Amino acid sequence: MGKSTLVNRIYREKTELCVCREGDYSPVDLAWCTWMSKEEYEVVLQKYAEIRDEIIKYTIEENGHFVIAYTKIITDIPNFHKDLEQYEIYNGRKNFAEWKEIVFSRFEKFRGTGYLFECAFFQNIMEDLILFHELNDEEIVEFYHELFARVDKESFRLFYLYSENIEEVLQVVKKERSDNVGNEMWYPLMMNYLKDSPYGKKHGYQDFEDMVTHFRHRQMLEMRVIEEVLGECAIVLPAKEWELEEVLAR
């Protein structure tokens, strides 16, 4: 039972919550969404005039920037999604100073309640810090000290799924995320993502063992942030054994 399962189970009991899954528009996270100037947005509207209305439907303007939840747009236009991917802020597409300012400002401005976010605080940010901006462990912990200082702590709770056996979890994910004839879909994409990152190239990432090493390192860092930064604002749950009643009681 992973992150999406946890989110779905919580929402089933708490339908009043506003759920922001990966790819949805989110007031804090920008994964799978664009971050564009007005000029860039106008170019995209002109270039893809045949789906202009769909693009507008999935666009939110934020103080002169345009956020398109572009993966929600279903189209057979060749390379549409690949084209809009270039306007994301993740995977090293922004220099560190600019990226940090965007991340910090969105968390600082957000003061809403009743939201349930998926992957917004750790996964997407942590991967960028490790793989693309190549911060060391101490710098990453300090980054989270600075970020958490900008968060409304009264309304913040982080549910963290912890696994004792990262390798076993990854083997299950490899198998589950395959097509109908057993071809692995997730693993090759994730392996290429790791191999092609600056960190992956520097450390010679090539195979499954390297992936296991990466996720162990990431989990260790996330647990450090929980212990040294978040404290009681985080609830650590066993990845396969959590009880919904315990989650809802928090």
Where are these regions (language model features)?
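Glycine-rich phosphate-binding loop used to anchor ATP phosphates in small-molecule kinases
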Residues: 54-152, 162
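Conserved substrate/cofactor phosphate-moiety recognition/catalytic segment
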Residues: 11-69, 127-129
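NTP-dependent small-molecule kinase module
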Residues: 185-250
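Conserved phosphate-donor/acceptor-positioning beta-strand/loop module used by diverse small-molecule
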Residues: 117-120, 137-193
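A structural motif corresponding to the C-terminal end of an alpha-helix
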Residues: 109-113, 146-159, 218-236
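Short, solvent-exposed loop/turn segments at secondary-structure junctions
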Residues: 24-26, 120-124, 164-167, 241-243
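Walker A/P-loop
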Residues: 4
